Amino acid sequence: MWREQNSEIMIKDSIQEEIIEEFSMFDDWLDKYDYLISLSESLPVIAPEHKTDEYIIEGCQSRVWVDARLEDGKIFYSADSDAIIIKGLLSLLIRAMGGRTPQEVVDTDLYFIDAIGLKENLSPTRGNGLVATIKQMRLYALAFTKQND
């Protein structure tokens, strides 16, 4: 669910391993939700002029905006949401996917989502929103790969 079907090799990466280690310090999901809320403070916030329908993620329970830019061959994301827990989720996604080449983003297996139990602990609508957000972030990356062709 969190990766493209054509990629069969799961490559561990240090950022996702750090996320897994951080979440392993908490015994229950109330503490993990508190941690997600604290992560919302580190979210690279989208520019106010980009909080428009053009940047909104369809399929999310909350309002979510995501933007991407390419700098020195690496993709960087900014985002915002009207829900604080979602801001924490966005912060995790940006941490795991940002600062990579567009092709790396397209190919990245976001295995940390299953490893920390996130999928099982989100409501179905929040889970659908997470999938929609990941899809949009990958679409931005794919568009940047096409620009470089």
For the regions a protein language model found, what residue spans apply to each?
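N-terminal amphipathic/basic-hydrophobic helices that include classical n-h-c signal peptides
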Residues: 1-9
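N-terminal intrinsically disordered, cationic/polar leader segments
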Residues: 9-63, 69-76, 113-149
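A generic alpha-helix surface/boundary motif
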Residues: 17, 87-88, 106-107
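Solvent-exposed interaction patches of small proteins and small membrane subunits
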Residues: 54-60, 81, 103-108
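Short, surface-exposed beta-strand-loop junctions and turns on beta-sheet-rich folds
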Residues: 83-85
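Alpha-helical support elements that line or immediately flank enzyme active sites
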Residues: 89-100
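Glycine-rich phosphate/pyrophosphate-binding loops
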Residues: 99-116
